[in-house]
């Protein structure tokens, strides 16, 4: 029996040393040479941190583009989805509620034209980006709330479209935080 326990303990200790020690130090070292030193990419306006580029946040004012809903209340410490299936009554109630709320604030939009990403939470609950379609459907509400032309708001959206890598890897996306910051800058001018 001793001949089985000692090798098992050695292997356990070696794995703990490697995965809890060396691997963690390796990842920390890689993070230190990356931009932002592993701290996350903060976004500042006038010297004040207003958010993180890779973390979604809640925008509910009609003057701003809205992010994708979060199942975790945009809490980075609790990142994750709701894990409710599409036939779950609670999930359907949440989605229906989001659709109704969206239609109240976006009177010119038909229910069938709402992109699913604006009423369903992402897997992480912290998605910072929306699609071009999700931005376009919000333009009339924002233009009206800010007293801007729809063309002016659309021009700002166009500047914020991140195209797929090499034209094929991924989809077009728009970072909601940077878009809203630029929208504020354009309105202040």
Feature-to-residue mapping (PLM):
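Extracytoplasmic/periplasmic C-terminal soluble domains
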Residues: 141-189
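Hydrophobic alpha-helical transmembrane segments in multi-pass membrane proteins
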Residues: 13, 17-21, 159
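Hydrophobic side chains within alpha-helical segments
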Residues: 13, 27, 175-178
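Membrane-entry signal-anchor segments at the cytosolic-membrane interface
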Residues: 1-16
């Amino acid at each position: 029996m001793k001949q089985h326990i000692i090798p098992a303990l050695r292997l356990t200790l070696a794995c703990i040393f490697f995965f809890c020690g060396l691997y963690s130090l390796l990842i920390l070292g890689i993070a230190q040479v990356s931009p932002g030193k592993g701290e996350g990419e903060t976004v500042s306006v006038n010297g004040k941190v207003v958010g993180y580029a890779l973390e979604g946040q809640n925008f509910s004012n009609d003057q701003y583009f809205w992010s994708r809903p979060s199942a975790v209340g945009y809490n980075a410490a609790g990142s994750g989805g709701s894990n409710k299936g599409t036939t779950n009554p609670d999930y359907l109630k949440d989605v229906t509620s989001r659709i109704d709320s969206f239609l109240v604030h976006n009177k010119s939009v038909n229910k069938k034209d709402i992109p699913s990403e604006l009423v369903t939470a992402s897997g992480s609950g912290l998605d910072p980006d929306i699609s071009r379609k999700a931005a376009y459907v919000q333009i009339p509400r924002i233009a009206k709330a800010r007293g801007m032309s729809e063309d002016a708001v659309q021009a700002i959206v166009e500047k914020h479209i991140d195209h797929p890598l090499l034209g094929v890897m991924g989809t077009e996306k728009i970072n909601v935080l940077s878009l809203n910051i630029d929208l504020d800058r354009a309105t202040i001018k």
